[in-house]
């Protein structure tokens, strides 16, 4: 079936309207009318081939929310009319250790929502900057937020799970001091989630202008990471630091703030590498630097349910489909609080 979308034909061209083809639903598939799709910084990286390997035409978008309009005859979990979401994963091998553990995000054969080879047919996946999508029911997620919050739920499908998964894995909660580095699309979700988990949350920013905003998001303290005295006041005090910054920076500035056995987890993906950390800083206090990538389907559903229970959504700015290129430029300037979301109904205008 032909539908309308917005995508790029090359790394050097702006995004533009295009028609794409979706498969008809199979026995286990769910067909979704997309209401909103979040704009992730990784969309920009992929469209401009900054991470290499982009296949064109590229239709980005992996923060998808909408309503079920049809299901295959073997689908058991969903019915037409259900509010659902689709995140970064639309398929995996389903039988490896990672898939059996509900960690499809680490499956060697995970299929991304866009720019991945399609497993059962020629071509590559096309994402949520489009009117509809067809996905196997295993990778569809139930949304329990009220309808009026649906647009602000969209970024939870990437920014939400990207921050929730490491916070859960490293046991953020009451009695724990948690740092969040960066107050952008990822960082603002990290602050909200760590606060809701009961941790003492310290936000790190290089911008004085973000100090009050960070407190409004739930930070107990805010530190200007360019202020040596403010940083020194927190030496050896953090159980866990969630580093959301994608730009290369000095990781040693933050590892020295960890307690013995503390961990800093990186979720921002820089286009060029960070400077190598000072190994002795890690050795002397058994510090760890780790990475984390989104989350599996069960954990993503857990995150959505947690957010619905605690009234958590992203802070968003709604845009039309014809404003995506402008939104990309604004995103590069840091001119968004904190996530753009496309109103997919404007694809027909």
Task: Identify the function of each model-found stretch.
Residues 3, 252, 297-349:
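C-terminal hydrophobic helical "lid"/dimerization subdomain
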Residues 269-285, 297-303:
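Rossmann-fold NAD(P)-binding glycine/threonine-rich loop
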Residues 23-37, 50-100, 105, 126, ...:
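Glycine-rich beta-strand-centered segment in the early N-terminal region that forms part
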Residues 174-183, 195-253:
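Adenosine-nucleotide cofactor-binding segment
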Residues 258-260:
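Helix-to-beta-strand junctions that scaffold the AdoMet/dcAdoMet cofactor pocket
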């Amino acid at each position: 079936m032909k539908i309308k979308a917005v995508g790029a034909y090359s790394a050097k061209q702006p995004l533009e309207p295009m028609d794409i083809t979706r498969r008809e639903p199979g026995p286990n598939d769910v067909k979704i009318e997309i209401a909103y799709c979040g704009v992730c910084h990784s969309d920009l990286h992929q469209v401009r081939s900054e991470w290499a390997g982009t296949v064109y035409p590229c239709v980005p978008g992996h923060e998808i929310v909408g309503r079920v309009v049809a299901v295959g005859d073997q689908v058991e979990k969903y019915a037409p009319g259900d509010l659902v979401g689709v995140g970064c994963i639309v398929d995996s091998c389903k039988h490896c250790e990672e898939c059996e553990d509900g960690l499809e995000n680490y499956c060697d054969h995970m299929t991304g929502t866009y720019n991945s080879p399609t497993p059962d047919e020629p071509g590559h996946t096309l994402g949520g900057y489009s009117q509809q999508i067809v996905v196997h029911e295993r990778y569809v997620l139930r949304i329990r937020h009220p309808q009026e919050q649906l647009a602000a739920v969209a970024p939870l499908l990437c920014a939400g799970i990207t921050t929730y998964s490491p916070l859960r894995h490293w046991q953020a909660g009451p009695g724990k001091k948690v740092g969040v580095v960066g107050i952008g699309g990822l960082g603002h979700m990290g602050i909200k989630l760590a606060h809701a988990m009961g941790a003492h949350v310290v936000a790190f920013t290089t911008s004085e202008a973000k100090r009050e905003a960070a407190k409004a998001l739930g930070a107990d303290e805010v530190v200007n990471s360019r202020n040596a005295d403010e940083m020194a006041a927190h030496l050896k005090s953090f159980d866990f630091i969630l580093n959301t910054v994608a730009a290369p920076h000095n990781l040693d500035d933050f590892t020295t703030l960890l307690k013995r056995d503390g961990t800093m987890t990186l979720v921002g993906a820089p286009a060029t590498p960070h400077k190598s950390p000072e190994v002795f800083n890690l050795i002397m206090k058994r510090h760890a630097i780790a990475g984390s990538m989104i989350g599996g389907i069960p954990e993503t559903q857990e995150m959505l349910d947690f957010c619905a229970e605690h009234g958590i959504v992203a802070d968003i700015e709604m845009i039309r489909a014809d404003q995506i290129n402008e939104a990309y430029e604004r995103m590069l300037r840091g001119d968004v609080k904190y996530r753009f979301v496309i109103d997919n109904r404007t694809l027909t205008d």
